[in-house]
Amino acid sequence: MNILQIDSSVLGDNSVSRSLTASVVADLVAATPDAKVTVRDLDQDAPAHLSGNLLPVLGGPKEGLSAIQEAELQRTEQWLAEFLAADVLVVGVPQYNFSIPSQLKAWIDRIAQAGRTFKYTENGPVGLAGGKRVIVVSSRGGVRQDANELDLHEKTVDIVFRFLGITDITYVRAHGLAMGPQFREAGLASARTEIAALNDASRLAA
């Protein structure tokens, strides 16, 4: 089993989402000792954001690329290969200003490629990256409410992964982290309970 751990928080060792993605991965490895883990730190190795200069890297002819574009192409191919090879993705998604970290969006822009991870048909787009399992570690300072229109960070990653053909998506939520010690501890305890529930043998059998 190939596990891809994606961390996008800018808080380093102080990050809740990073500590929780590490816990999820540790439990997965304990259940499947031969698992191969790849860790992609999008803060320390941040993808360049989408720009006109970057567009040739993401599609079209690859002849005549500049040295910078060629380097970005190699990075893009590495990230795409990691994504395609993964059986399980563990993705840390903190909420920043209602949405996902910009470096996570930049990574999505690299791996969401027509003809590679999805295709267009006469009946609409079809995802080509199905068969994977995604575990989203969602962290936020406030408290989530059902159907909250402000939960854009979870909605964003859910839409993206489903667009790419992935339907097995589980959430581990650590919320209320900025609302004082009592809410913070309750949020962390809830997340730890959800992580423990991931160890259902039937879910890990594959």
Curated annotation (Swiss-Prot):
Keywords: Flavoprotein, FMN, NAD, Oxidoreductase
UniProt xrefs under HAMAP family: Azoreductase_type1
Similarity-based family: Belongs to the azoreductase type 1 family.
SUPFAM superfamilies for the chain: Flavoproteins (SSF52218)
Cofactor note: Binds 1 FMN per subunit.
Molecular function GO terms recorded: electron transfer activity; FMN binding; oxidoreductase activity, acting on NAD(P)H as acceptor; oxidoreductase activity, acting on NAD(P)H, quinone or similar compound as acceptor
Residues binding FMN: S9, S15, V16, S17, S139, R140, G141, G142
Gene3D superfamilies tied to this protein: 3.40.50.360
Cofactor: FMN
Subunit note: Homodimer.
Superkingdom, natural source: Bacteria
Record gene name: azoR
Cited Pfam families: Flavodoxin_2
EC number: 1.6.5.-, 1.7.1.17
Record-given protein name: FMN-dependent NADH:quinone oxidoreductase
Enzyme class: oxidoreductase
Catalysed conversion reaction: 2 a quinone + NADH + H(+) = 2 a 1,4-benzosemiquinone + NAD(+); N,N-dimethyl-1,4-phenylenediamine + anthranilate + 2 NAD(+) = 2-(4-dimethylaminophenyl)diazenylbenzoate + 2 NADH + 2 H(+)
General function of this protein: Quinone reductase that provides resistance to thiol-specific stress caused by electrophilic quinones. Also exhibits azoreductase activity. Catalyzes the reductive cleavage of the azo bond in aromatic azo compounds to the corresponding amines.
